[in-house]
Regions:
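Conserved P-loop NTPase "ATPase switch" module shared by AAA+ and STAND
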Residues: 68-80
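Walker A (P-loop) ATP-phosphate-binding motif of ABC ATPase nucleotide-binding domains
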Residues: 7
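Hydrophobic anchor at the beta1->P-loop junction of P-loop NTPases
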Residues: 10
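Short, solvent-exposed loop/turn segments at secondary-structure junctions
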Residues: 14-16, 76-78, 117-120, 155-157
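Conserved substrate/cofactor phosphate-moiety recognition/catalytic segment
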Residues: 13-16, 20-69
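NTP-dependent small-molecule kinase module
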Residues: 2, 126-169
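A mobile, often basic/glycine-rich helix-loop segment
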Residues: 80-98
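Conserved phosphate-donor/acceptor-positioning beta-strand/loop module used by diverse small-molecule
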Residues: 73-75, 93-123
Length: 169
C-alpha cells in the first residue's frame, strides 16, 4: 500500500493515547487532524444514520479534493461503540452502518489504528466509569474491519508511527 492521499483513523476507548498518537502521526506525516469539536456537537442529539451519512460524506469529500492525507481522531468505530453503549443506538442497525462505512474506507485504502488500553482499570478510573464493555465492542469492530489495521497501546506509539510511515511512503 503506497497511498499518497491516505485516510488514517485512530480509534479506542477514552484515556488510552489516541490524541497523542494523532499528534505524533501529524508531526511525522504533515497530515492535518480532524476531530469533532465537542463544544459544537450535542451527543444527546446524535443519530446513527446522521452520523453514518456525515462520515460517508467526509470520505467522499476526501477522495474528491485529493488534498493529501488526513488523520481522524475517532470515526466510525467510536460512533458504533459509544452509540450502542451510551446513546441507545439499535445494535443491528449500528452494526450494518459500521460495515457500510468500513466498506467505503476499505475501498479508499484507509488505515485504521486501534489504541488498546495498557490498563483498563486506569483508563476507566480516569474516565469516571467502567470502559470494559466499550473495549470489547472496539475489539469486535476492529476484527470486522476489512481495512488495513494496526493495533497498538500507549507504550508502543513510536513503533506504530513508524509502521504507518512505511505503509504510506
Amino acid at each position: 500500500m503506497k497511498n499518497k492521499n491516505p485516510i488514517i483513523i485512530v480509534e479506542g476507548i477514552d484515556r488510552v493515547g489516541k490524541t497523542t498518537l494523532c499528534n505524533m502521526l501529524s508531526e511525522a506525516t504533515g497530515f492535518p487532524i480532524y476531530k469533532y469539536d465537542e463544544s459544537v456537537v450535542s451527543y444527546d442529539k446524535m443519530d446513527n444514520d446522521n452520523e453514518t451519512d456525515k462520515m460517508r460524506q467526509l470520505i467522499k469529500l476526501h477522495e474528491l479534493t485529493n488534498a493529501g492525507g488526513v488523520i481522524f481522531d475517532r470515526f466510525h468505530m467510536s460512533d458504533f461503540v459509544y452509540g450502542i453503549l451510551n446513546r441507545k443506538y439499535c445494535t443491528l442497525h449500528a452494526r450494518d452502518n459500521l460495515l457500510l462505512i468500513d466498506s467505503d474506507l476499505s475501498a479508499a485504502e484507509a488505515i485504521v489504528i486501534l489504541v488498546d488500553p495498557v490498563d483498563i482499570k486506569y483508563s476507566s478510573d480516569m474516565h469516571g466509569s467502567d470502559l470494559s464493555m466499550h473495549c470489547l465492542f472496539f475489539s469486535y469492530a476492529f476484527l470486522k474491519s476489512k481495512c488495513c489495521t494496526l493495533a497498538t497501546d500507549y507504550n508502543h506509539l513510536d513503533a506504530c508511527v513508524n509502521c504507518v510511515k512505511e505503509l504510506i511512503e
